[in-house]
């Protein structure tokens, strides 16, 4: 199992230079990859193109970029450019986002999200392979389009798929799934089998911190990540795991605890562990990164 970390999502390291420096630290620590969320700050795909020019080895991925505001041909072109810029270390992670964002904030329709993702991938995936697309769907229509991005190989594409229909689509059309707030039991019994294939990429992202102040860390994480317990898709995963909130999914404790919990994700079928380090107290980020480095 590859071990990576989330960058640019802790609220402190939020300038472009900070994100680059954190990625460099992760690379120096020997981690396999870094993952960047696309929320309301820097564009994740563009940022990782820059990170790719400033690093040498570490894998780069979006976790994730929303599909609705971006035509699949546009995101394919942008992603292939980032693949070329990073010498093909880039993994494109895409997702639907959430109904409250797409409808209430962006004023777009969130009708038939699974159909949207199927059509999106049916346009996107051939473009990443250098093929010419001729496609007529209900939401997208593309004719005679091919992309030529020198230096860009076909990149892995993972979908933020949690429900059974989306998992089936991700397994059928993409390379796997990129998850967040999914516990090891749900991963083993629902996510991995739901993809329907043995060679799928399964990214498991969870909060993590190395600390002896367990109760304080749980309380802080619960407060800081409270919204993830309220969004329907994540709430469903927490309920499947039988836990109350994000603080119960988080991996918190000493080195033995962290090592054992990470092993549970590996045993569940996760191929890429995405450690979202929670800087809940002074020195927590550095300690946790050093611990993750020791596992390599």
Show where each model-derived region lies.
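Active-site-adjacent structural elements that line small-molecule/cofactor binding pockets in enzymes
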Residues: 1-296
